[in-house]
Design a protein with these regions (language model features):
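Short, flexible turn/loop "capping" segments at secondary-structure junctions
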Residues: 4-8, 52-56, 120
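Short histidine-centered catalytic/ligand-binding loop motif
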Residues: 9-18, 64-66, 126-130
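Active-site nucleotide-donor binding segment shared across nucleotidyl transfer reactions
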Residues: 31-59, 65-69
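A structural signal for short, well-ordered beta-strand segments
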Residues: 46, 61, 110-114
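Conserved catalytic core of two-metal-ion nucleotidyltransferases
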Residues: 82-118
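Catalytic cores of NTP-dependent nucleotidyl/adenyl transfer enzymes across multiple folds
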Residues: 112, 118-178
Length: 178
């Protein structure tokens, strides 16, 4: 995971990198090996999965599992440690969040949902909509840059500032899929 990651709490936007999908594939392979049979689907989501827009250099991975309680027990007993840490406080998206950290940097966020959870489904819909609507992707990038300039030192406000736009895009994606 060369040159990917940020120190926890730091906010930085970087240009899109062609190797994000390769880095995701490496992570996917590792996670499938660790969680043998506990993953029903795994996807690259978040801004690094949207072609040609600036993003935080952290790979977002969405895992869906049929048995969330078993997944959590397994993670906390067998996986959590120096490299993988679980965010104990609830997330804004309601997911079970695992951080992968190496060399003092968060390299990936692993968002885990029960299979079929709407938050997981809409994360994929958002990614797909943005990749097929380049004009919206550029608007999203412009919003991210504007929020970054305003909230460089406040990652939470930066994230909250994107919420309304993300919800609008998800609504468009849902309507388009009907």
């Amino acid at each position: 995971m060369d040159n990917v990651g940020l120190k926890r709490g730091v906010l930085e936007l970087m240009d899109y990198r062609e190797d994000y999908s390769e880095i995701y594939e490496e992570e996917k392979k590792e996670l499938l090996q660790i969680y043998k049979g506990r993953i029903s689907s795994i996807d690259h989501v978040g801004s690094t999965s949207i072609k040609n827009i600036k993003s935080k250099p952290i790979i977002d991975i969405l895992i869906q599992t049929d048995d969330l309680e078993d997944f959590i027990r397994f993670t906390e007993s067998n996986v959590e440690g120096e490299t993988y840490t679980v965010k104990k406080e609830p997330t804004m998206g309601g997911d079970y969040l695992i951080r992968k950290e190496e060399d003092g940097k968060v390299k990936s966020f692993i968002h885990v949902y029960k299979t079929g959870d709407m938050n997981g489904i809409t994360s994929i819909m958002f990614r797909d909509y943005m990749n097929s609507h380049k004009d919206e992707a550029k608007r999203y990038e412009e919003l991210k840059i504007e929020l970054y300039e305003k909230y460089k030192d406040n990652r939470k406000e930066y994230t909250l500032g994107k919420d309304k736009y993300i919800k609008e895009i998800i609504d468009k994606a849902i309507k388009e899929s009907l």
